[in-house]
Amino acid sequence: GFGSVLGKALKIGANLL
């Protein structure tokens, strides 16, 4: 669901950092 999308975005953001 939406939470899964948020989790994915956070994972990608962490990778960028």
From Swiss-Prot:
Protein's UniProt keywords contain Secreted: yes
Sequence positions bearing Leucine amide: 17
Lineage top rank: taxon: Eukaryota
Naturally occurring in which organism (per UniProt): Xenopus ruwenzoriensis
Keyword Transcription regulation in record: no
Tissue specificity: Expressed by the skin glands.
This protein's name: Caerulein precursor fragment-related peptide R1
GO BP terms: defense response
